[in-house]
Structures are given as C-alpha cells and as structure tokens.
Regions:
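Residue-level signal for pocket-adjacent positions within structured domains
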Residues: 39, 64, 86, 96, ...
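Short glycine-/acidic-enriched loop or helix-start segments at secondary-structure transitions
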Residues: 66, 91, 147-149
C-alpha cells in the first residue's frame, strides 16, 4: 500500500478522526522536519512505558498513586465515579470539583455487548470503603449506556456491606444534554450538572430524595 494512504488509514482508527482529518494530519506531518517526526515517534513508542494506571482510582499518570489521589488538600470524603479517563480530565480542566475520582473504564452497553465486570464493581466498593466516603457521585454520561451503568452501580452500592452509615449517593443533574458526553461539555454545563446533582436514597428500595 502507498505509505501516505497507509498512514491515513491508521489515523482513521483514532476516535472521531475521519478520512479528511486523517489526510490533513498526514500532510501536516510531511511538512515537518525529520528530527521532529523522530521525536514524535519516540514519544508515541514510549508512551505506555512511561505511564501507569493508578491502583487506587484507575487514572493514568507517571506515578502510582496518581497526583490526584496523593493530594492531601483534596476532599477525601467525596468520590466521583466516571466512565473513563476522558471524563476525569474534563472535570479537572473545568476546575469545579475538589474530591477524588474512581474510573470504571467500562460500562453497561447492550449494543457493544459490554457489562461492568465484577472486578470493576469490587474495585469501586473497596475504594469507597477505604475512603469511608460520605458521598459517592455517579457521574455517568446522560445516555442509555450511562443510565444502565448508573442503575447497576446504584444496586451494587445499596447491597454492599461495610459502607458508612448515611452515605449519600448522588447523580449529575441534567444540565448535560441527553445523549451528550461529559468529555465534550463546557465548564458552565459541568458546573451546573455537578452543583444541581440529585441525591438518591442509599437504602434498599429507596428512590430519589425530594
């Protein structure tokens, strides 16, 4: 295959990158000097070697635990549960939340034949117990997969032993558009969704608090 066409095809495998965007990227690279391309290639080749997954929250950083989990100034009694690292980054860049996180790195999606693994749920429950969290914010995306993931987690939290008595469980408010994604939400939208979050009963059979 032609080297240009081959590289374009490789770039189209990136999320959100179509053929036109991939083509622009390739022709941009062709204009750079060899040293710059070699440096970029080295950074890509060593990316996974220089990073690790935080054993506490699932974030990716150069150290374990990650800087967020290591920060003694953060609110260690509030835990925000997100679907993936992109969502964590969105909250951090918005600067609206000062608690800790837990990255699920999977979700419930019937269309993709995905489900929350028992290991993923157990890891979350262990993290909550370790922190003795006062509040768990379930920050799944406002679409069908996020709803299914939310209810799966809610059931697991309600049935789990060893949680703090009176622990609050809440969910982001729908300042986020239905079908949207935390990853692409602006700061004001995320702030509204977080500040107006809905509390739900932690007890078995409980519904949303009024």
């Amino acid at each position: 295959m032609d080297p240009i066409a081959d590289l374009i095809l490789s770039f189209t495998k990136f999320p959100g990158v179509g053929n036109k965007s991939a083509r622009r990227m390739v022709f941009y690279l062709l204009k750079r000097d060899s040293a710059e391309l070699q440096d970029l290639g080295r950074r890509i080749a060593t990316l996974k070697d220089e990073l690790c997954v935080c054993s506490r929250c699932g974030n990716v950083s150069s150290g374990d635990p990650c800087p967020i989990c290591s920060d003694a100034l953060r609110d260690r009694e509030t835990l925000c549960v997100v679907e993936d690292i992109d969502d964590l980054v969105s909250f951090e860049q918005a600067g609206i939340y000062n608690g800790l996180y837990h990255v699920l790195d999977n979700r419930v999606s019937p269309f993709d034949d995905e489900d929350l693994s028992p290991e993923s749920v157990d890891s979350l429950l262990s993290h909550i117990r370790e922190l003795d969290a006062k509040e768990v914010i379930i920050a799944t995306n406002p679409r069908m997969e996020g709803d299914l993931t939310y209810y799966t987690l809610l059931d697991a939290l309600r049935e789990a032993p060893g949680m703090r008595e009176g622990m609050k469980i809440s969910r982001l408010a729908f300042g986020l558009p239905v079908g949207g994604s935390i990853e692409f939400a602006d700061r004001m939208t995320l702030h509204t969704a977080l500040e107006s979050r809905t509390a739900v009963s932690a007890g078995n059979g409980g519904g949303e608090e009024k």
